[in-house]
Amino acid sequence: MFLKSLFGKSKEKSLTLGKLSKIIGAELPRAVDGSALCRTVLTQPEYVAPGDVVISAGWYDHRRVVSQSLEKGAIAVFCPAGKKAALFQDDDRVIAVENALECVKRYELWRENGCKAKRIAISGSVGKTTTTGLIGSVMAGCFRTLTHHPMANSHGAILRNIQKLTPAHEWWVQEVG
């Protein structure tokens, strides 16, 4: 029960590729099946499983992110239009967007809609993970608390965690930076 309250359950929001593209402001090519279900939205290929969607936001090399994501079974990868044209022109699974970072932001805002959890963000140069874990453990004893992903010190961690946030959570403790 402790781990369930500490990490929470995924918020059940059925998401198709077509709906995701509208949320993030992207236009799907005609050849892409907009009714395909999106399992998880990520920014890093290391976490991709079949059915996931990736937004290559520019934190990592686009060629590597797109290629590895597709190899691992991502149904689509959104990336900057210039990179799509230069590197992946012939692959319909790679979808051009004007501003990939803005796409991540729009998705996160949509994802947290309806969730009223208060947030505690832990930053600094030393002790973030320990402090986040300690505060999360203490908070989980009294409140429905979501705490950070085990590999939270990366750009994609907040995106991975926000997909676990539910309206039932009262607090969200997140390591940042």
Where are these regions (language model features)?
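N-terminal leader/targeting and accessory segments in enzymes
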Residues: 1-104
